[in-house]
A protein has these predicted regions:
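Nucleotide-sugar donor-binding catalytic core of glycosyltransferases
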Residues: 1-239, 243-263
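Short acidic-hydrophobic, aromatic-tinged amphipathic segments that line or gate anion-handling sites
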Residues: 265-267
């Protein structure tokens, strides 16, 4: 089974503006290493010429941050400074507007949301944008699933653990509801949930982080898992739960409804 995650998606596109290694030199980083977005990127220019000989459109992959320039909110000062610097170096929509070719763009990897400003910045030669956390969807902008988290360091084998589980027959859940999430990423949405279900014999509440094997084991042992909004509307937990054939419990939101209407029925 090919599991959905950002790096796997980037490999399906004609050109990706991020390195696959998630690495700066010999140091692994939380961010994918960015490639230059601009006409000075000769590797990209050569790929455009190559693809144009075959068809009149090209598929591109980029992180959410460098898709277009906009104001960033609800970020700490360090992250905001880093993200703004990345946008100043170049954005994909601006680059596409300077080229005589059609493009279809896919995004993943970072959870910075897509806001209303994007609709005025999409050039005519961009046919469609499939973007994660596309809160302002519609027109050429289509919501896309976040999927699983990419490998973040050399010893990160979470994807392999899920693949191993899925290679075996599913088990029958023995309990009803599992709760395990940090509260600091979104206190407004997450504070108080543990207390609602704590002490119920049909629910398991983990207040502390557990190992990934144990985390997945608990998901499989329960029919449902509470999946509150974190840094963004969509999160990796939702897709871990779905891949393990359990039901994520989420607060109703138009974006999540739009996303699930086209995706969840196919899983």
């Amino acid at each position: 089974m090919n599991l959905l995650e950002g790096v796997a998606l980037s490999r399906l596109c004609d050109y990706s503006f991020v390195e696959e290694s998630a690495q700066w030199g010999n140091i692994f980083s939380p961010f994918m290493k960015p490639k230059l977005i601009g006409l000075q990127n000769h590797e990209f220019q050569n790929k455009c010429r190559e693809v144009k000989k075959q068809r009149d459109y090209m598929t591109l992959f980029v992180d959410n941050i460098r898709l277009y320039k906009r104001e960033l909110y609800d970020l700490n000062d360090d992250d905001k400074q880093t993200f703004e610097h990345l946008m100043q170096q170049g954005t994909v929509l601006d680059l596409c507007s300077k080229l005589n070719m059609n493009f279809i763009i896919f995004t993943n990897l970072e959870d910075v949301p897509i806001d209303d400003k994007i609709h005025d910045l999409i050039p005519k030669n961009v046919l469609a944008i499939s973007a994660i956390n596309a809160v302002s969807y519609g027109g050429k902008v289509h919501p896309a699933p976040y999927g699983l988290q990419r490998q973040m360091h050399p010893g990160d084998n979470r994807k392999q653990i899920i693949e191993e589980i899925l290679s075996h027959e599913d088990i029958e859940p023995t309990n009803l509801l599992y709760i395990n999430h940090s509260t600091y990423t979104n206190p407004k949405e997450r504070l108080g949930i543990n207390e609602i279900f704590e002490g119920k014999d049909w629910a398991l509440v983990n207040k502390e982080r557990v190992g990934y094997d144990e985390f997945l084991s608990h998901i499989r042992d329960h029919k449902f898992m509470v999946c509150p909004i974190g840094n963004a509307l969509d999160c990796h937990r939702n897709w871990e739960v779905l891949y393990l054939r359990r039901v994520p419990v989420m607060r109703k939101h138009p974006y999540l409804e739009e996303l699930s209407s086209s995706i969840c029925g196919q899983i």
